[in-house]
A protein has these predicted regions:
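Acidic catalytic/metal-coordinating carboxylates
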Residues: 35-38, 61-64
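Two-component/phosphorelay signaling modules centered on CheY-like receiver
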Residues: 12-31
Length: 122
């Protein structure tokens, strides 16, 4: 059964680059969201066991999404993928429950070790 994966970024190009960086042989069903509100909607519909999340988005940013997921005690593996590397960002996303922080652009080489570490990809 395909693993539901959600790619969240306000940039369609960034979503495309990230999707292309996912392992080609990974059995997944990918959904896309362009903002945090839609990301939470997809999650509540059961379409996100793994979420690749940008931090800087209109409407609801990645930090707000992480905070809401944590408040609701939701079970999802969140990998933050962002170009916004501000001091303290890594610590903040980890405190909010993200399993990893990947600097854009994402690549298969950056993602596979994280996915393997959490048993999401073999």
């Amino acid at each position: 059964m395909a693993l539901p994966v959600l790619v969240v970024d306000d940039s369609a190009l960034a979503r495309k680059i990230l999707i292309n960086a996912l392992p080609a042989d990974w059995d997944i069903e990918v959904q896309q969201a362009s903002n945090g509100t839609d990301a939470l909607k997809f999650y509540h519909e059961g379409k996100a066991s793994v979420m690749f999340l940008d931090l800087t988005m209109p409407d609801m940013d990645g930090y707000q999404v992480l905070a809401q997921l944590k408040r609701e005690d939701l079970n999802v593996f969140v990998i933050v993928v962002s170009a916004d590397i501000q001091p303290g960002a890594l610590e903040r996303v980890k405190q909010l429950g993200a399993i990893a922080f990947v600097k854009k652009p994402a690549s298969t080489e950056k993602l596979v070790p994280i996915l393997k570490e959490y048993g999401l990809y073999e």
